Amino acid sequence: MVEFPFEISPMFEGERVRKEGMFVELGGPKSLGLELVRAKPMDEIEDDKVTIVGPDLKEMEEGKTYPWAMIFNIGGELVEPDLESVVERRVHDFINYCQGIMHLNQRYDVWMRVSKDTAAKMDSFEPFGQAVMMLFKTELPFIEKMQVTFYTEQAEVEKQMETAKEIFKARDERTKDLHDEDVDVFYGCTLCQSFAPTNVCVVSPDRVSLCGAINWFDGRAAAKVDPEGPQFEIAKGDLLDANTGEYTGVNDIAKKLSAGEFDKIKLHSFFDSPHTSCGCFEVVGFYIPEVDGIGWVNREYQGMAPNGIGFSTMAGQTGGGKQIVGFLGIGINYFYSPKFIQADGGWNRVVWLPSMLKDKIIDTIPEDLKDKIATENDSTDIESLKAFLQEKGHPVVATWAAEEEEEEEEEEEEEVAVAAAPMMMPAAGFQMPAMPMMSGGSSGGIKLTFKNAKITIDKMIISEKKEKK
């Protein structure tokens, strides 16, 4: 048996390589990171070959971040292009089996770290590549031959990235004419449960996986060739609500895979029992109550959203396999779904996108909304966002007037009720109690609004304040 300079075991899944224990970082938010699997004829593959283009591990400087691309070629009698993304998604699994090597995300968002301990035992990426290929061929026996090329040189990584994005785009377009109502089964994926134990990823024709790497066709291909693998069939069951995308079969699997933490998942709802979020999602949505709208921020965006929070902070709040009302992780291709958060207004509820994300998905944004959705070039805080939405006449602005009318009606009703209530006024004058003031200066312009709140007072005692002698 081949020996490797690090241990290999599923027990290392979920292992984090922290910054203080890191030798080098590959890809991630500070650089480029890519993984791609291509099906090739058997005679074009040199089995188990590892090629490194650019600096190898021993030539890298400790603590630095380097661009990174992994291109795997696979071959076999049963290998076909439909399996590429399925095999590609298992890269996350098998790399994390390697002690001291951390892998996060997918496709063009790959983020890896090699620990100091592991780097001290190997001076090249070659044994790492051989270990990953061994795991692939052991776990997925339909792969008969495999080779990999690692790129660490900036220009080469950029070149591979450009080619890969076209491949990803072609894959994603396959599901555009297929919808949830056209099929009898959906597919589930548990790949992210090593990092998010209660995550339940449901893939339907109208909802791509959170990582963006698995669509409905990919799930079908994976379940067919690897029935015991992380992608599996989900019987839809009965449709409970077409608008929210609630199915009995999805609810059953949600309860089972989350160990009872969740009993329902609504595929196309943002607020009511939303899809769980793992951490590998490409984009995170966030509710902005001040404008009653939803903003979205992608992983690559390094700035702040109008709520004063960046992607990494929101991702930490959203991920972990939880249902967090007000936050939602999605795959970018979900923007192209005709059922995109349809239970909560769809595109009419979207008020803010980073310009890089807006440009990327501009062809799916409804024509009448393209100039009404703000970017960081139009708005950097809540007040400027409000002004922009009012100026452009965004659909959410109409809800503000309705809310204000409702508040005014409630205030009038309260005034009438107070006026009608009998009150015994004391003979002597009295002073209403003053509101307690916050220490430390100005209150900061904080306004508290209670909506639909019922306050019951059992007894009110009004007493005359006596002067001290």
Curated annotation (Swiss-Prot):
Pathway terms, separated by semicolons: One-carbon metabolism; methanogenesis from acetate
InterPro entries found in the cross-reference section: ACS_CODH_B_C, CO_DH/Ac-CoA_synth_bsu, CO_DH/Ac-CoA_synth_bsu_3_sf, CO_DH/Ac-CoA_synth_bsu_arc, Prismane-like_sf
Record: residues binding [Ni-Fe-S] cluster: 189, 192, 278, 280
Cofactor annotation remark: Binds 1 [Ni-Fe-S] cluster.
Pfam family, one: CdhC
Cofactor(s) the protein needs: [Ni-Fe-S] cluster
EC number per UniProt: 2.3.1.169
Recorded catalytic activity of this chain's protein: Co(I)-[corrinoid Fe-S protein] + acetyl-CoA + H(+) = methyl-Co(III)-[corrinoid Fe-S protein] + CO + CoA
Keywords on record: Acyltransferase, Iron, Iron-sulfur, Metal-binding, Methanogenesis, Nickel, Transferase
GO molecular function: acetyltransferase activity; anaerobic carbon-monoxide dehydrogenase activity; CO-methylating acetyl-CoA synthase activity; iron ion binding; iron-sulfur cluster binding; nickel cation binding
Domain of life assignment: Archaea
Gene3D superfamilies linked: Bifunctional carbon monoxide dehydrogenase/acetyl-coa synthase(codh/acs), Chain M, domain 3 (3.30.1650.10), Bifunctional carbon monoxide dehydrogenase/acetyl-coa synthase(codh/acs), Chain M, domain 5 (3.40.1470.10), Carbon monoxide dehydrogenase alpha subunit. Chain D, domain 4 (3.40.970.20)
One Gene Ontology biological process: acetyl-CoA metabolic process
Keyword Metal-binding: yes
Family per record: Belongs to the CdhC family.
PANTHER family from the UniProt entry: ACETYL-COA DECARBONYLASE_SYNTHASE COMPLEX SUBUNIT BETA 1, PTHR42281
Function: Part of a complex that catalyzes the reversible cleavage of acetyl-CoA, allowing growth on acetate as sole source of carbon and energy. The alpha-epsilon complex generates CO from CO(2), while the beta subunit (this protein) combines the CO with CoA and a methyl group to form acetyl-CoA. The methyl group, which is incorporated into acetyl-CoA, is transferred to the beta subunit by a corrinoid iron-sulfur protein (the gamma-delta complex).
Record text on subunit structure and interactions: Monomer. The ACDS complex is made up of alpha, epsilon, beta, gamma and delta chains with a probable stoichiometry of (alpha(2)epsilon(2))(4)-beta(8)-(gamma(1)delta(1))(8) (Potential).
Name listed for the protein in its UniProt record: Acetyl-CoA decarbonylase/synthase complex subunit beta 1
Species per Swiss-Prot/TrEMBL record: Methanosarcina acetivorans (strain ATCC 35395 / DSM 2834 / JCM 12185 / C2A)
Gene behind this protein: cdhC1
